[in-house]
């Protein structure tokens, strides 16, 4: 029996990334974006386009537009949803997650869900801060998936 393992790599050469970032909760989303851009720079990504949207709920529509453009190897969706005293948190978080997954499946382009859902801003800063920046981690996933999809296309 022959077993082949196909994995993506963390190489940025020849990779083009589209980033959709929400402005709402920008103290957190700016940190996520900073972490992602740091990752892309360290891995020599050639082209990154950043598109800002009002809030996390608007991310799926713009992610769809970027994915369908044919210009990007992966799309990274960054946002922050902070729990309040209403059910709005759950509605937004669930719909954004579903929307991002649908865009990825429908377009065939990896769309990475980089929307943090937190109880309060302190928890958000712990996830988007200097000690641990989820933006960097989500960017790594975008790189890995972009390269994996390229490899899978070569196998067809």
UniProtKB/Swiss-Prot annotation:
A GO MF term: 6,7-dimethyl-8-ribityllumazine synthase activity
Entry binding sites for (2S)-2-hydroxy-3-oxobutyl phosphate: 85-86, 127
Active site positions: 88 (proton donor)
Gene Ontology CC entries for this record: cytoplasm; riboflavin synthase complex
Catalytic function, reaction form: (2S)-2-hydroxy-3-oxobutyl phosphate + 5-amino-6-(D-ribitylamino)uracil = 6,7-dimethyl-8-(1-D-ribityl)lumazine + phosphate + 2 H2O + H(+)
Chain segments annotated as transmembrane: none
Statement: the UniProt record of this protein carries the keyword Transferase: yes
SUPFAM superfamilies: Lumazine synthase
Pathway annotation from the record: Cofactor biosynthesis; riboflavin biosynthesis; riboflavin from 2-hydroxy-3-oxobutyl phosphate and 5-amino-6-(D-ribitylamino)uracil: step 1/2
Keywords: Riboflavin biosynthesis, Transferase
Function statement: Catalyzes the formation of 6,7-dimethyl-8-ribityllumazine by condensation of 5-amino-6-(D-ribitylamino)uracil with 3,4-dihydroxy-2-butanone 4-phosphate. This is the penultimate step in the biosynthesis of riboflavin.
Protein name: 6,7-dimethyl-8-ribityllumazine synthase
